[in-house]
Amino acid sequence: MGKYFGTDGVRGEANVELTPELAFKLGRFGGYVLSQHETERPKVFVARDTRISGEMLESALIAGLLSVGIEVYKLGVLATPGVSYLVRTEKASAGVMISASHNPALDNGIKFFGNDGFKLADDQELEIEALLDAPEDTLPRPSAEGLGTLVDYPEGLRKYEKFLVTTGTDLSGMTVALDTANGAASVSARDVFLDLNAEIAVIGEKPNGLNINDGVGSTHPEQLQELVKETGADLGLAFDGDSDRLIAVDETGEIVDGDRIMFIIGKYLSEKGLLAHNTIVTTVMSNLGFHKALDKQGINKAIAAVGDRYVVEEMRSSGYNLGGEQSGHVIIMDYNTTGDGQLTAIQLAKVMKETGKSLSELAAEVTIYPQKLVNIRVENSMKDRAMEVPAIANIIAKMEDEMAGNGRILVRPSGTEPLLRVMAEAPTDAKVDYYVDTIADVVRTEIGCDN
């Protein structure tokens, strides 16, 4: 990743790191780069989630886009995948989403989509970064009729909702509990599930600019678990702040994570002959139980680096149509080009309705192994070379021998901090504690910063 762009756009504390000045420049330089091959006036969609800083950054970003002659369609509050969908179907030059996803309200972010609805390629991001770092802004400064125009486009939300409904099935007789995280899904999820004829109960639907992801949503599903039990709902659905991920809750109040959601949808598609190459794309963080369930079902798997952009890259390069992460990013390429929490929720409910099975029955086919992750602070120069240390390599090999295939160890560096992540999965909590703690002790002794 570059100096400004991470794996999911530009992020930082709003008005401190991600300032209006930077947002203006991102609009100006990003709009210029993405419109270079347009023969007509470029059209760009802009949306945001419900953070208090969203309107400030939106105004600055739009000013930058207008300054290079872009026709801006202002969508207001909308889910990230809604931007991706509209860019493709309305033939726009690009889309921009202002959100920090599952992060707290003080953070925000800006991410771009190309005219194909996919996140920008690395070379495009680097081109924008080069303009940001240039000593002088030498881009054209049109005036009068050369300036961009601004169009309020609330119809975008309705079009996205209509699209979501067309992917589903009649949910009459089903009760669905929704947690919209006081975020972008708060403007759409209720209407979508009512249009599908579900009975609904909703929490996290009163955003005030400061409460996005605060004790609600996919990273805090506890309130949803209680709501499911209180209402007797058939399933619960928790989205994050920009609604690009989903965590589900079964009718007993148990969490159903991204691994299980992918398995349920993947098995359904596979049995109908609709799973491309009979393969699901996942990452090294997916649970061993998920891998074993796929093997038992005869479904292939392709492993991508951690991060939904890398899952998408693997899907695009090899022609797969289903992939995702344990965290709840699920990409169903037949419908959209990025993770879409509401779309995934609708497909999950569709499988339940068409199979006549409860979510707990469907999820039971994946036995989730206990998992433990420990972060160890190490010298930054050593985090990528840990496996070169004989004592560390030897203890990992010893633990893997003891597992005899009934467990998994993953040791990897953090992409952003001087940390080494030690993760293990095993059939029992006691065993997983033993494996992780044994390896972590050796890592701390050999390269830990606290020595």
UniProtKB/Swiss-Prot annotation:
Keyword Isomerase in annotation: yes
Record PTM Phosphoserine, positions in chain: 101
Post-translational modification remark: Activated by phosphorylation.
One GO term describing the cellular component: cytosol
Cofactor(s) demanded: Mg(2+)
The reaction(s) this protein catalyses: alpha-D-glucosamine 1-phosphate = D-glucosamine 6-phosphate
Pfam family membership, one: PGM_PMM_II
Residue positions of the active site: 101 (phosphoserine intermediate)
GO process annotations (BP): carbohydrate metabolic process; peptidoglycan biosynthetic process; UDP-N-acetylglucosamine biosynthetic process
Domain of life: Bacteria
Record note on cofactor: Binds 1 Mg(2+) ion per subunit.
GO MF, one annotated term: magnesium ion binding
Matching CDD domains: GlmM
Key words, A-Z: Isomerase, Magnesium, Metal-binding, Phosphoprotein
EC number: 5.4.2.10
Residues where Mg(2+) binds: 101, 240, 242, 244
Protein function: Catalyzes the conversion of glucosamine-6-phosphate to glucosamine-1-phosphate.
Family, as annotated: Belongs to the phosphohexose mutase family.
Protein name from the UniProt record: Phosphoglucosamine mutase
Species assigned in the record: Streptococcus pyogenes serotype M18 (strain MGAS8232)
Source taxonomy: Bacteria, Bacillati, Bacillota, Bacilli, Lactobacillales
